């Protein structure tokens, strides 16, 4: 049974000014530090949904990812914050947000480091499956921690939900952005990665994952669907994409040349 713990933020430590989403380092009531992703930032709850779904798929594929937790942000939190931009972000993020366990001492992955071809292939497969456009040489979104490769930041995935139409067509796209993937040159075992993914992913897994999405992350002003209908579209997207994985696997192979 898939599950996430829920913690409450006790202390805002500092902003992590990466991209436009202004994540932050914060301490929670379990005394651990988390990289906090805010519902009031950038693409809002859709980014959190991408992070949640992508993170759980990452876990199930057996890849290393910091623990994901739901994070409560109290209405009074951040009132003493001097930076107005950050204060506005905290105010607009009252309620349930998402956090990733902070890997203290980790370093950004250097593309020159040799890694196992199957591991590289699984990560490329993951990103092609969830349509994550943001694991490039410019921004690897990979960390080395305790001599192991960790996957972070899946918030730029499932980008079909920004237009929210023709999800069936979107689920069968070849994902041309794979050509920019930082690990593509090392991904020499894409067929094996595809086989592995089909062994561990299935409808039951997808149903459990979409059921993790909090109800209030599905109250969209720009969609006519109910929260349950939105959940169902995410489920159908993943189900269809897995059934047609050869489309994006072939695209990745062709991009490798």
Where do the protein language model's features map onto the residues?
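Phosphate/dinucleotide-binding and metal-coordinating scaffold of catalytic cores
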Residues: 1-257
């Amino acid at each position: 049974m898939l599950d996430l713990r829920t913690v409450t933020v006790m202390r805002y430590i500092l902003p992590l000014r990466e991209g436009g989403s202004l994540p932050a380092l914060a301490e929670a009531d379990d005394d651990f530090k988390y990289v906090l992703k805010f519902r009031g930032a950038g693409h809002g709850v859709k980014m959190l949904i991408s992070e949640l779904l992508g993170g759980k798929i990452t876990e199930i594929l057996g890849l290393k990812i910091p623990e994901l937790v739901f994070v409560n942000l109290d209405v009074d939190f951040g009132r003493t914050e001097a930076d107005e931009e950050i204060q506005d972000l905290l105010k607009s993020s009252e309620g349930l947000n998402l956090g990733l366990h902070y890997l203290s001492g980790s370093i950004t992955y250097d593309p020159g480091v040799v890694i196992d071809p199957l591991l590289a292939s699984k990560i490329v497969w993951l990103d092609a499956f969830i349509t994550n456009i943001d694991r490039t040489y410019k921004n690897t979104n990979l960390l080395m921690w305790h001599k192991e490769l960790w996957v972070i930041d899946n918030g730029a995935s499932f980008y079909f939900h920004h237009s929210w139409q023709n999800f069936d067509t979107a689920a069968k796209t070849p994902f041309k952005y794979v050509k920019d993937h930082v690990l593509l040159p090392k991904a020499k075992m894409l067929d094996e990665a595809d086989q592995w993914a089909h062994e561990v992913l299935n409808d039951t897994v997808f149903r459990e994952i979409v059921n993790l999405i909090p109800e209030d992350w599905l109250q969209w002003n720009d969609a006519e669907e109910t929260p349950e209908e939105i959940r169902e579209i995410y489920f159908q997207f993943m189900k269809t994409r897995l059934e047609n994985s050869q489309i994006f696997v072939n695209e990745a192979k062709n991009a490798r040349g």
